[in-house]
From Swiss-Prot:
Sample GO molecular function, one term: phosphoglycerate mutase activity
Assembly, per entry: Homodimer.
The organism's place on the tree of life at top rank: Bacteria
Name of the protein in question: 2,3-bisphosphoglycerate-dependent phosphoglycerate mutase
Sites marked Transition state stabilizer: 181
Family: Belongs to the phosphoglycerate mutase family. BPG-dependent PGAM subfamily.
This protein's pathway: Carbohydrate degradation; glycolysis; pyruvate from D-glyceraldehyde 3-phosphate: step 3/5
Residues reported in the UniProt entry to bind substrate: 7-14, 20-21, 59, 86-89, 97, 113-114, 182-183
E.C. code: 5.4.2.11
Gene Ontology BP terms: gluconeogenesis; glycolytic process
Amino acid sequence: MELVFIRHGQSEWNAKNLFTGWRDVKLSEQGLAEAAAAGKKLKENGYEFDIAFTSVLTRAIKTCNIVLEESDQLFVPQIKTWRLNERHYGRLQGLDKKQTAEQYGDEQVRIWRRSYDTLPPLLDKDDEFSAHKDRRYAHLPADVIPDGENLQVTLERVLPFWEDQIAPAILSGKRVLVAAHGNSLRALAKHIEGISDEDIMGLEIPTGQPLVYKLDDNLKVIEKFYL
């Protein structure tokens, strides 16, 4: 069995080195090109999908659409879920990473970005950019909508969707594409690869590059590689 992850192509805020999180940012021109190249590469290597899962953020949805279109598979059903959203960076969202490091120190920013269990400063619920005010989350209970997350909380959010939707799809024989975000994919990778809390800090998933997992019948990783 195989599973393919793809992190969305470069976003406009990736290009500007800003914290993005749940802010809905478009793909940059480079990001659009990365998604198209990924779709072509998947087609060239014979990858076909039966279902695709993505987040409710534009940059991931757009990447998923482009990948499927470029691989002549735009007909493949897509399921969009907030559970595959990027990690919520709290009050850091929209801030310049370099300027934030100058203010708080490189080590503090590294911990906020990469540690497993350290939360960022939380966003106020009445902030104009709070997810509580975004209608795409209107169906969710208020206490479920995050104001800031670490990777541990992100995994706790993503894992129920893995167990309820993604894993059963794979086990039923479906060929699955997951088009999501750096940290939601890091969380899934931690789970399926059994990566330790310490080692996950060093895991980077590049934008727009298909990551293939070969899995056994228990969804244990046999092999992983980038196309």
